[in-house]
Amino acid sequence: MSAPAAPIPLESRASGPLSGTLRVPGDKSISHRALILGALSVGETRISGLLEGEDVLNTAQAMRALGAKVERHGDFAWTVHGVGVGGFAQPAATLDFGNSGTGCRLVMGAVAGCPITAVFDGDASLRSRPMRRILDPLELIGAKVTASAEGGKLPLTLQGASNPVPVVYRTPVASAQIKSAVLLAGLAAPGVTTVIEQEASRDHTELMLKHFGAEIVTTLEGTHGRRIALTGQPELHGAPVIVPADPSSAAFPLVAALIVDGSDLVLSDVMTNPLRTGLFATLREMGASIEEDDVRGDAGEPMVRLRVRASKLRGVEVPPERAPSMIDEYLVLAVAAAYAEGTTIMRGLHELRVKESDRLEATAAMLRVNGVKVEISDDDLIVEGRGHVPGGGLVATHMDHRIAMSALVMGLASDKPVKVDDTAFIATSFPDFVPLMCKAGADFA
């Protein structure tokens, strides 16, 4: 089990206008997948722009433990020499994923199709998160799981299938992690593995599988869903990957620029995959000035330059269908809603309850302690925006990086400073968040 980092408290104070050009870290979802698929490929994969946060570094270490050669060649430049589909070696030690649910669940899928046994573990936060909905389909494929805690929680032992079988699996919720775990396990199975989802989730795994040479076909399923069919036992080939800037990380300086008067900030190379841009669409509905140019792409993932200027925001209603495209951004959207005029209602946020913390309750608590009127009704979050935030509160982050960053953003325009009890976990996804924001003009102390 990972040892907890020493707490790093921080205070956020009202700042002057934010300006300049920032390049936020590489996308976390793409970084995990590039390492894993590089390890499952034959030959060399060159990755540029890899996120070097703790979550991704733990995935890199897991790939080494499973037999791939993973090397760093300078800032954000990495190579992976893979072992091929089904070629993972028996790890000599526990695979420790720290705080990373994404890395842990995706690697479970990749291991499930290999005739090896691996022990999975993480920190206290990850040990509290449910794994059963990932494990159920992996057991259908042929894996065997032994877990010491109820609900399949970590630590657990996963014995991969000696003869994995293809499945047709309908996901119980819109979850890219469930879908990806099934597809990664299905790589080693003969025949076609099919995943059916009622609501489309992030499609990074499908796009990257194609980039590495897999035969995968996606068709529409109903009104909002998709059917993904993967032909198993391909020979994947190493490929170059340019990791775009993470839209979930870009959300924090973006919202900061919207709420701090006079701000004019440019964010470069931000991924705009349509299944990741729900926040941008919502903020534009609220009146945000967000412009795009310099459109380009790599490995099927589009990226753009964003120019964001301070804006007067208004309350809106966010439909539940938008949740899969912005599930990690609701915390900082709630901050924007607090600075808006009028009521913002965010519907269908049940998935926030099973993240690094119960993010629904934690978001409401973050706002309340800083003088914002907020209500939870079932799985809906209702924020009464008054155009300003009183501030002055101490935010408990519950070891959650996104709560910490959202609270720090909130304090940049509040009447009184906002204190955060611990910012150490920001390193899991955005190691340079504080210096990068200070470079743009933020006041943290």
From Swiss-Prot:
Source organism per UniProt: Bradyrhizobium sp. (strain BTAi1 / ATCC BAA-1182)
UniProt protein name: 3-phosphoshikimate 1-carboxyvinyltransferase
Compartments in which it is found: Cytoplasm
Entry keyword set: Amino-acid biosynthesis, Aromatic amino acid biosynthesis, Cytoplasm, Transferase
InterPro entries documented for this protein: Enolpyruvate_Tfrase_dom (IPR001986), Enolpyruvate_Tfrase_sf (IPR036968), EPSP_synthase (IPR006264), EPSP_synthase_CS (IPR023193), RNA3'P_cycl/enolpyr_Trfase_a/b (IPR013792)
Record field: catalytic activity: 3-phosphoshikimate + phosphoenolpyruvate = 5-O-(1-carboxyvinyl)-3-phosphoshikimate + phosphate
PANTHER family for the chain: AROM/DEHYDROQUINATE SYNTHASE, PENTAFUNCTIONAL AROM POLYPEPTIDE
Biological role: Catalyzes the transfer of the enolpyruvyl moiety of phosphoenolpyruvate (PEP) to the 5-hydroxyl of shikimate-3-phosphate (S3P) to produce enolpyruvyl shikimate-3-phosphate and inorganic phosphate.
Enzyme class: transferase
HAMAP family: EPSP_synth
Name of the coding gene: aroA
Pfam families: EPSP_synthase
Biological classification of the source: Bacteria, Pseudomonadati, Pseudomonadota, Alphaproteobacteria, Hyphomicrobiales
